[in-house]
Amino acid sequence: MRVGFMTYDSKINFYNIKGALTQPQMMTVGDVNDMFVPMAEGLMCTVEESEAVIDSLMEQIPQMFGDTRETETILGPVIQAGKEAFKAAGCAGKLIVFHHNLPVAEAPGKLKNRDDRKVLGTEKEKTVLTPQNKTYNEFGQECVGVGCSVDLFLFNNAYIDVATLSQVRPLQFCSHITCDFMMYFISSGLSTKWWPNVQVHLLSTRLRRRTILSRSSSQSQSSCGF
């Protein structure tokens, strides 16, 4: 099984993790309105082939992005990037996205903040409990077209519009957690998981357990994964 990694805020970073490298190489795509994969080789590799490079990348990501002050993030182009990666690799697989806030940056999949406490308990409440549009449903359908499924983990501590984002399905929901970067994992899951008031120091253990269980499911036995 091959794996790959991406990180993002308002841009998307792709990583060359070819085993022959001493360090992972990062390439950034800033124009996310016309998504493409910037590298032909090294984006997806087996863990056995690239274990040392992957370990190095996992150590570097918190150092590279721990102090980021980016306030607007994307999500739609990330899903499109994963789709394009699987398409370029000519393999089916699974895209695992860890996301933590409402995608409000100018890009495909941008959403409005509909958080309005005044409508709770009124007739208008149902308007914020239904999807804003069908964009994320369309993203999911495009992925299915190339044999790519999407697992979306949400780590939010503010309004994130689950009604709209959940159209990508399946969804894992972890509330009140701040997550500053996204990574590509092999996982699966067919139900919504909500972890309210999770303590950050316990998150890694619980999330690791969840992804291991998901990976062992029959749906994760594909040849590629982000």
Which role fits each region the language model picked out?
Residues 81-84, 92-94, 101-163, 186:
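VWA/integrin I-like adhesion module and closely mimicked acidic/polar interface patches used
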Residues 18-27, 104, 109-122, 166-172, ...:
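Short secondary-structure boundary/capping segments
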Residues 1-99, 127-135, 161, ...:
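Von Willebrand factor
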Residues 1, 6, 20-22, 59, ...:
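Eukaryotic complex-assembly/interaction regions
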Residues 60-69, 108, 120-127, 148-154, ...:
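Short interface patches used for recognition in eukaryotic signaling and trafficking proteins
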Residues 2-4, 11, 21-26, 58, ...:
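Beta-strand-rich binding-surface signature
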Residues 130-226:
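Acidic, polar loop-rich interaction surfaces within structured domains
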